[in-house]
């Protein structure tokens, strides 16, 4: 109660801008099964959470070569940013965060978590093609957000378990650090800040994240 009292006396300074994203399926939070626009089939047994992916479009990795991401679907919904712009205009006294970019987690949804962990060690051409597909989509996604008067962009990937990273620090630095840096550089070039969320124990990555430009981490 004491904490609630303190919070009630303080104004919220940071807000997340809304966006009616056509690639973000509302069925995420409903009980049942469905296939999203990426081709991942979700199963949810409890309303209010997003469930789990049970069927992956790249369970057969050969399919990666003829895959088309939902980039066109995303671009078809750019008009949804009108509500975003109106929100920004009415909250100019606040720090506004935009977007939500999940690179590693999207790769898991497409390939399967266990498969992806093995892929980081095998380093097949299909694995790097998967990474390329995800990077290409989110580059387009980021470009549209950077056209708006937001103050920062959010990146969210859970990299830790309770005790350690999900993959070795060396593998992360080799494969994912350059990937994130390309995105973070683009955000900073646009004069905006990089916010990053990751659950789990990620202490071993802090120096790397600072080096490549994370401004705030949760």
Region annotations inferred by a language model:
Residues 45-46, 50-57:
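Long, mid-chain structured domain cores
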Residues 7, 55-64:
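Active-site-proximal helix-loop elements at catalytic-domain edges
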Residues 2-19, 144-150:
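Catalytic domains of carbohydrate-active enzymes, especially glycoside hydrolases
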Residues 1-2, 35, 44, 62, ...:
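Active-site loop segments of alpha/beta catalytic cores
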């Amino acid at each position: 109660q004491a904490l609630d009292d303190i919070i009630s006396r303080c104004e919220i300074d940071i807000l997340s801008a809304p966006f009616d994203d056509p690639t973000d399926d509302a069925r995420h939070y409903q009980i049942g099964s469905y296939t999203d626009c990426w081709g991942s089939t979700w199963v949810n047994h409890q309303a209010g959470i997003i469930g789990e992916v049970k069927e992956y479009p790249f369970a057969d990795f050969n399919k990666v070569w003829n895959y088309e991401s939902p980039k066109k679907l995303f671009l078809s919904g750019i008009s949804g940013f009108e509500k975003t712009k109106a929100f920004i205009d009415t909250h100019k006294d606040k720090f506004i965060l935009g977007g939500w970019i999940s690179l590693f987690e999207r790769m898991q949804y497409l390939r399967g978590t266990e498969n992806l962990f093995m892929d980081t060690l095998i380093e097949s051409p299909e694995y790097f093609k998967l990474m390329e597909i995800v990077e290409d989509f989110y580059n387009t996604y980021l470009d549209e957000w950077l056209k708006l008067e937001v103050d920062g962009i959010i990146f969210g990937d859970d990299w830790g378990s309770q005790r350690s990273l999900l993959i070795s620090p060396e593998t992360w630095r080799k494969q994912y650090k350059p990937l994130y840096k390309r995105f973070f550089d683009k955000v900073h070039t646009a004069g905006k800040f990089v916010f990053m969320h990751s659950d789990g124990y990620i202490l071993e990555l802090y120096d790397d994240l600072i080096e490549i430009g994370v401004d705030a981490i949760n």
